[in-house]
Amino acid sequence: LVIVFVVLLGVPLISANEEELLAILQDQRNDARGGCLNRYKSNICGTLVTPMNCITPRTRMGKFARKFCQFMCGIC
């Protein structure tokens, strides 16, 4: 009886989680930037690292900008 109870509760939880994951995946596929993610959007890319850093690839800030702020540099 306990096993049946656990299975009956577990199946809807897994299904709801799967639907949520599919929705997230679909949002990423429909992203206009082609999957280019901004991992540092609130604190680094755009405030500390500027688009001017994208044109200086030999500096440390330029290397960081081209690697992690690709949306800002137009690489995506």
From Swiss-Prot:
This protein's major location comes to secreted
**Residue ranges listed under propeptide:** 17-33
UniProt keyword terms in alphabetical order: Nematocyst, Secreted, Signal, Toxin
In Swiss-Prot or TrEMBL terms, this protein is called U-actitoxin-Avd8c
What's this protein's family per the entry?
Answer: Belongs to the sea anemone 8 toxin family.
The record's GO CC annotations read:
extracellular region; nematocyst
Native organism is: Anemonia viridis (Snakelocks anemone)
Q: What top-level branch of life does the organism fall under?
A: Eukaryota
Q: Where is the signal peptide?
A: 1-16
Where is this protein localized, as stated in its record?
Answer: Secreted; Nematocyst
* Molecular-function GO term, any one: toxin activity
Classification lineage: Eukaryota, Metazoa, Cnidaria, Anthozoa, Hexacorallia
